[in-house]
From Swiss-Prot:
One of its GO terms (biological process) is flavonoid biosynthetic process. The chain crosses the membrane at residues 8-28. PANTHER family: CYTOCHROME P450 98A9 (PTHR47944), FLAVONOID 3'-MONOOXYGENASE (PTHR47944:SF18). Keywords: Flavonoid biosynthesis, Heme, Iron, Membrane, Metal-binding, Monooxygenase, NADP, Oxidoreductase, Transmembrane, Transmembrane helix. It is found in: Membrane. Its cofactor is heme. Heme binds at C469. InterPro entries: Cyt_P450, Cyt_P450_CS, Cyt_P450_E_grp-I, Cyt_P450_sf. It comes from Oryza sativa subsp. japonica (Rice). The lineage of its organism: Eukaryota, Viridiplantae, Streptophyta, Embryophyta, Tracheophyta. This is Flavonoid 3'-monooxygenase CYP75B4. Pfam families: p450. GO terms for molecular function: flavonoid 3'-monooxygenase activity; heme binding; iron ion binding. It is a single-pass membrane protein.
Amino acid sequence: MEVAAMEISTSLLLTTVALSVIVCYALVFSRAGKARAPLPLPPGPRGWPVLGNLPQLGGKTHQTLHEMTKVYGPLIRLRFGSSDVVVAGSAPVAAQFLRTHDANFSSRPRNSGGEHMAYNGRDVVFGPYGPRWRAMRKICAVNLFSARALDDLRAFREREAVLMVRSLAEASAAPGSSSPAAVVLGKEVNVCTTNALSRAAVGRRVFAAGAGEGAREFKEIVLEVMEVGGVLNVGDFVPALRWLDPQGVVARMKKLHRRFDDMMNAIIAERRAGSLLKPTDSREEGKDLLGLLLAMVQEQEWLAAGEDDRITDTEIKALILNLFVAGTDTTSTIVEWTMAELIRHPDILKHAQEELDVVVGRDRLLSESDLSHLTFFHAIIKETFRLHPSTPLSLPRMASEECEIAGYRIPKGAELLVNVWGIARDPAIWPDPLEYKPSRFLPGGTHTDVDVKGNDFGLIPFGAGRRICAGLSWGLRMVTMTAATLVHAFDWQLPADQTPDKLNMDEAFTLLLQRAEPLVVHPVPRLLPSAYNIA
């Protein structure tokens, strides 16, 4: 009996051990199987053969993508020809890309714009993330966009604002006219913003008396770069069509690049030869950005040890191109949208003017030192950036490695677009998202502590993360200074056949979110006459 009992116990023990081993193996292989199961790709609409979803984008891509997120969710996948493209359409999804996985999405995909216009990516906008890119960005950050540099360059911005006011005041008092003259406001603002930046960058005003053919050429180049840059080049996404250049985009880019390169070579040669007068109104004589860069090249003060990482004339020209493309029309466009919204909302305009009258008075013009006291006006600027971001879609980034976002698999090499415009109109974040309500940013409002500096992913007009706009601080100060000056110095009337409630607010999208119709207005001086008597 004892032997039989022992045999039974041994048999039970062996059976238990065997079952335990089987269960363990089953669990291990089950988990391994689950681990091997790939995550799904983000959802998205079915595309066309060869072209993918390109034909579905339409003329206003940001609006089309916003509508797609309503159907497929806040993270969608598209095919642009042979390229995988993912679109972030909500603040939480954008935060995963631009904060949690920022390092993985710090480079740009190669495209025809970077290759043919931006010196083959040897710039800050299109350049790949790495030592050269960091060195170039540091140059801009220290010499143009740091707090000290901004304060040093304050006189440029204020002087150009003064000249803009003088021009508008003279137009309003044109002899022989019974009513103020009409002006295309965007053009006036663009002269102001472009000249302020050009004085800081190359030591002279682009638009100035006697500037002549060179100024016209410069402006034409910047405008055409913005236009061509906003075109989706099919050849970037369908390699078989690249050599055909079916849209003629690459041919235009090459021609445009030659024009810009010739112009910059002449400017650099003149500066080196000493025939271009050094600016007498810069921080130190000759210490505009171009002068600093040329000195760096001449003195062999390389920021990196390797021969390939030197800053050369090519990098200088690429940087100057970046500055003018990213820092001129973007700024004037936001100011124009701000003024259009204020004209449409007379009560908000009145409130802004009352604040300015208290802070500044009516016997002088605004200065930058006044800006920190303009609580309501800062809320106005934030609300304009929310509804009318100058770049409604972020410039594309690229996944260096495969990763997981919001439970979906993002393939290596996938291109990322963030729908800045759509996120800022998300009713889950913004009550009454289509209404222009600066009060939402005031103390006691729904978004009191939100800023536009990349910290709040519901409002990222300058982007976020490592690739956030290098010129954020300059752009924000220039927009606020220019718009506040216009509101303080003038009342604004529309042409006789228009009323504020019927003002056309349609968008025209290239690389920028511009107005479909330019804002034409009549400026009426509202300060004491002595305020406009500027030496």
